[in-house]
Amino acid sequence: MHRASLICRLASPSRINAIRNASSGKSHISASTLVQHRNQSVAAAVKHEPFLNGSSSIYIEQMYEAWLQDPSSVHTSWDAYFRNVEAGAGPGQAFQAPPATAYAGALGVSPAAAQVTTSSAPATRLDTNASVQSISDHLKIQLLIRSYQTRGHNIADLDPLGINSADLDDTIPPELELSFYGLGERDLDREFLLPPTTFISEKKSLTLREILQRLKDIYCTSTGVEYMHLNNLEQQDWIRRRFEAPRVTELSHDQKKVLFKRLIRSTKFEEFLAKKWPSEKRFGLEGCEVLIPAMKQVIDSSSTLGVDSFVIGMPHRGRLNVLANVCRQPLATILSQFSTLEPADEGSGDVKYHLGVCIERLNRQSQKNVKIAVVANPSHLEAVDPVVMGKVRAEAFYAGDEKCDRTMAILLHGDAAFAGQGVVLETFNLDDLPSYTTHGAIHIVVNNQIGFTTDPRSSRSSPYCTDVGRVVGCPIFHVNVDDPEAVMHVCNVAADWRKTFKKDVIVDLVCYRRHGHNELDEPMFTQPLMYQRIKQTKTALEKYQEKILNEGVANEQYVKEELTKYGSILEDAYENAQKVTYVRNRDWLDSPWDDFFKKRDPLKLPSTGIEQENIEQIIGKFSQYPEGFNLHRGLERTLKGRQQMLKDNSLDWACGEALAFGSLLKEGIHVRLSGQDVQRGTFSHRHHVLHDQKVDQKIYNPLNDLSEGQGEYTVCNSSLSEYAVLGFELGYSMVDPNSLVIWEAQFGDFSNTAQCIIDQFISSGQSKWIRQSGLVMLLPHGYEGMGPEHSSARPERFLQMCNEDDEIDLEKIAFEGTFEAQQLHDTNWIVANCTTPANIYHLLRRQVTMPFRKPAVVFSPKSLLRHPMARSPVEDFQSGSNFQRVIPETGAPSQNPPDVKRVVFCTGKVYYDMVAARKHVGKENDVALVRVEQLSPFPYDLVQQECRKYQGAEILWAQEEHKNMGAWSFVQPRINSLLSIDGRATKYAGRLPSSSPATGNKFTHMQEQKEMMSKVFGVPKSKLEGFKA
């Protein structure tokens, strides 16, 4: 109950009834009158019961909720108070003094002054100074406890260097001072009843001194707990119990020994690397060595709770340590990365602190096998976050793990990047979305209180680097790394929280960086005082070693034996690493598909056509909806139109997509289509999810209703994010090659907000990390007068990143047999601009039937979705048909090649513009139009065929994009390498260079179109009067 609502219960019965009746429709009181009555009620109640004013009301609301659940859970005086409120007591009548029994002594009130009636009827108020004071004091204690729960983290001892305050504020919040409540030294030994919203003692009451000490021990030492921003009382109480309950954080001697051994591995590993390779960059973990025990504790606890697959995303710092001591990648394999060895595999490879791995091993605590994958990633901080989440979601999907009980993400962050990178919030925002949730990740922040050389006061505007987590309701646990036992407790709570509530949680390891940004960097230039202190600071291992020796947990001999044992392990691994003669990139696969490549001929491309009966059945289903389903009238016409297209043997783009998806689904292949508005389609062509017009949330997906045993079709509208969602779908595509995963941009122009994923992961992922992906990017593209932000998917950028040489030696290359398959095998990705429904159908099916996986960048159409010429006959989908890399001229010019004056190569929608213009200017016999449907790998063989067919013709490349954009700079050297043997060269016909992708003026757009057509057909612009593309 909100404060005003509760207070209104104290108003006169007539006002209460008026308000109740107004809200239930029994009265005609206007909204303004209702507000006036409410305000009067609040004022009257506060006047007679002053403890309802100010911040006290927040606590009273919580106590009222607790009382509704269990009246005995609150103080007897509050029980009587709430009973009287419920019974309709007016202002000044609800409060009663506490009873003489039970609590009178504790509250310092005489029994005579504390007599109270607890019947349900309103009682006469006993207005004694003692009773008012007792309840006032009681409330002050409750508010004091709440203040520590809310603000205690602000004064916690979090910085292991003792220099900074983790929240960038050295002041003490006034509400944590006794004087704020009118309390002082005189009250320290008075005993107070504990409220139901704390668990600091098993007793019902404590002295103020004891209360203060417990609160400081819990909230103000080496752990700072942020959780009062959660809007769920059950979650708040859950966290309180795990931090406030006495002795809850204590470890056994055996647990302390395990922690000590893990600290040895973490610390001595870095020291060993520093000794052997002092001038090598490795981005070590010195200053936050406790990260390794922390991660292992999260994995131990989560494994015990049922998780058996962990996907880790992390930056470069500490990566080698994680690979060695969390994943248990063989040490010799890691150490060999420091040697200058020849790679055994193709590809560029990557630096050692970017590499991923996938390991399966026994977890000793749970005695279960667990799989741990560290996802390879670039130096672009936080870019890996959504990739990890997508991989987790896919693993859970294929395992039938609907609630991610067995699959979990662990994301590591740096403090500056966590606060600074927008993709962090984009990724957080996916967490509760039905088709993207992974049901909670554990975030661990390596908070070394500096970003390269930037002070945190210059790198964030919020108090903590973790404040982004407050937006989505994460509990946040700040912990000083010099208290490893506190870190272990926090990690246990984090694992338990994720299991219980399936929500994200943040562990903020407040630490330092012992060296510079890397081992060769000099930090004293910019942080002299901090690094003077660091030089004087012992390692966490040294401090914890002293602690366990002082506590008698271990003796000197035990410590020495453990240190010697791990030192020997490192030296043996070093000796073995010297015997390694080459580096195997395949040792660092984060998503291995070993079974997929077995018994597959990498140079054999199966046919992608399907049987006629399948075509009819899929289109039939795609055109129907269930009986009793209230479909929009406009969609009824659309569905009938699909059936008619089948009868007319003329299928449109939506049917081509549906046939690709439906045929794969019937073969048991999982299809996932994701992006903004993909269910309907940005241009309202798809309608894969039908909505009942009368029943909210009632939907029908016809492609999920094709046949029994079919693959699942997931078509999901995404959040308005490109960066995180594309990264998510990339991670999803990495898990199972027997799937079709597609991301569609709302407009291709917007894909550049995901440029980091495109550049660092998709275009180069296989070369760097031997990681294949069949992800498809659909990027709506086409110049239709819609301005610079709704015209171009920037094809020039994607083509520039293709790994294909633009020169070809015709004497050494044979354009036959396996040429097409070899090109596909060798390329880093496929770039296409299809013009027919049949071709997009074949391209999508080919993504799954190929014996390997390659990303595909497809410049998809807008106006062609409904263009009457952009149709395909049924036979183009049938068995024996395949993707056409080049679609040759099939009209009159193809019948008389010697008469052809010009051959115009093009790609995409502009073809249909040129067909219309060719007819308009009467050039249908002497200008041949050839469509290049697949730009990369470039179809040298088929382009050569067309050039040879029209030996005497002039060769042009036409495009609607500006000269410095589009495919021109990509195709020119390639076509010329084919023509050079005949002494010919291709010419350009299109728009002039420009800084802007397109004009926003409709008139200018039409003039540019006519200018382009004038160049294409060699006619004056006057001949194009009246032409409309």
UniProtKB/Swiss-Prot annotation:
It is found in: Mitochondrion matrix. Pfam families: 2-oxogl_dehyd_N, E1_dh, OxoGdeHyase_C, Transket_pyr. It catalyses: N(6)-[(R)-lipoyl]-L-lysyl-[protein] + 2-oxoglutarate + H(+) = N(6)-[(R)-S(8)-succinyldihydrolipoyl]-L-lysyl-[protein] + CO2. The keyword Transmembrane helix does not apply. Its main location: mitochondrion. InterPro entries: 2-oxogl_dehyd_N, 2oxoglutarate_DH_E1, DH_E1, KGD_C_sf, ODO-1/KGD_C, THDP-binding, Transketolase-like_Pyr-bd. Its cofactor is thiamine diphosphate; Mg(2+). Gene3D superfamilies: 3.40.50.12470, 3.40.50.970, Multifunctional 2-oxoglutarate metabolism enzyme, C-terminal domain, TPP helical domain. Mg(2+) binds at residues 415, 448, 450. Keywords: Glycolysis, Magnesium, Metal-binding, Mitochondrion, Oxidoreductase, Thiamine pyrophosphate, Transit peptide. Thiamine diphosphate binds at residues 317, 415, 448, 450, 676. Its EC number is 1.2.4.2. One of its GO terms (molecular function) is oxoglutarate dehydrogenase (succinyl-transferring) activity. Disulfide bonds: none annotated. The keyword Metal-binding applies. GO terms for biological process: generation of precursor metabolites and energy; glycolytic process; protein folding; tricarboxylic acid cycle. GO terms for cellular component: mitochondrial matrix; mitochondrial membrane; mitochondrion; oxoglutarate dehydrogenase complex. The 2-oxoglutarate dehydrogenase complex catalyzes the overall conversion of 2-oxoglutarate to succinyl-CoA and CO(2). It contains multiple copies of three enzymatic components: 2-oxoglutarate dehydrogenase (E1), dihydrolipoamide succinyltransferase (E2) and lipoamide dehydrogenase (E3). Homodimer. Component of the 2-oxoglutarate dehydrogenase complex. NCBIfam families: 2oxo_dh_E1 (TIGR00239), PRK09404.1 (NF006914). Belongs to the alpha-ketoglutarate dehydrogenase family. This is 2-oxoglutarate dehydrogenase, mitochondrial. It comes from Caenorhabditis elegans. The lineage of its organism: Eukaryota, Metazoa, Ecdysozoa, Nematoda, Chromadorea. The gene is ogdh-1.
